[in-house]
Amino acid sequence: MKLVLTEEEQFLKDTAKNFADERSPITHFRALRDNNDPLLWDKDLWSEMTKLGWPGILIPEDYGGSNFGITGISVILNECAKTLTPSPLFATGVIGAYSITNYGTEKQKEFYLPKIVNGELTTALAIDESSHHNPADTEIIAKKQGSSFIINGKKTFVIDGASADLIILLARTSGIKGDMTGLTLFLVDANSNGIDRRKLDMADSRNYANINFKNVEIPDSDILGDLETGGETIENILDIGRIAMASEMLGNAEAAFETTLDYLKQRKQFGVLIGSFQALQHRAAEMFCEIELTKSSVMGAMKAADEGSNELQRLSSLAKTMAGETLHLVSNEAVQMHGGIGVTDE
């Protein structure tokens, strides 16, 4: 496994960097947040991303995509994360595209995938029912009734849940809470009768929602994958999501580190640049080392996904864990090393 980007992947990364820097600086996201934008992402910006083909990176060419792989979509997310580019790319271009491509029926692929590629359809993955993430704790019920299922229950903290057109829902068709068997994935039209979505205001200003399902009827043709194989399927989908999220968090950490490094080279205290203080140099060096280690971990997980490695689950979990810890370290250190200006929002 070579932990380097191919020429094509590097080109994609460079394109994403230029796009994010020019079309979506951090000030763009702050404006959406401060103006209480209901979507918290820009439709015009999403349209531009669609023209670049980003929602179709994981989708086969037969359905209009480019089939560029997990590495391709991850390097885009990495660059977009550096400027906090607001978009449904993670929930739709990663989770939605991967789920339907790998587990959808031919009819489902033909219907949904071209719409994802064209930017006509956004998706959201609804799995959690409390603040604790554990798919096995699924209690929302999908009860068989003729050729349909009746859905009752709730989902919480659904990313892009307030705006998505299609909900990928994990529900229980048999068994009890805590059991990974008896779970089934469904493709649910977000505008179906009986669905109530409540947008949440979160600290990171991302688009989340709580979703209630009351006697929502969906045909059995809308099962994603096979009946009661949802436990195994969702684990694979989450592995891919972990890699994409790790790449995003790495981008956040890289941007925070670069901003801090620039500040150390400009800010003077006691008549000298604070970057000349050895204690701050040591702290900056630690951040640099952790970021470089995380890069290798994330790259390893991306390549494992594209190569179909049996180590995917382990490497994806490792990448997300390392990225989370590194981002926590760097963001905390960035605030501390900026001093008082580090806790302002302007």
Predicted segment positions?
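Long, acidic (Asp/Glu-rich), low-complexity accessory segments flanking structured domains
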Residues: 215-232
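Flexible, small-/acidic-enriched active-site or ligand-binding loops
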Residues: 137-139, 189-220
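A short core secondary-structure module
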Residues: 152-196
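Short Ser/Thr-interspersed hydrophobic loop/turn segments at strand-loop and sheet-helix junctions
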Residues: 53, 74-81, 171, 187-192, ...
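Alpha-helical interface subdomain recognition
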Residues: 1-87, 103-108, 115-120, 135, ...
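A short, Trp-centered hydrophobic/proline-enriched beta-strand micro-motif
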Residues: 119-128
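Helix-loop "lid/cap" segments that line or gate small-molecule binding pockets
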Residues: 95-103
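Short beta-strand-to-turn element immediately C-terminal to the catalytic PLP-Schiff-base lysine
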Residues: 102-104, 143, 169-173, 187-189, ...
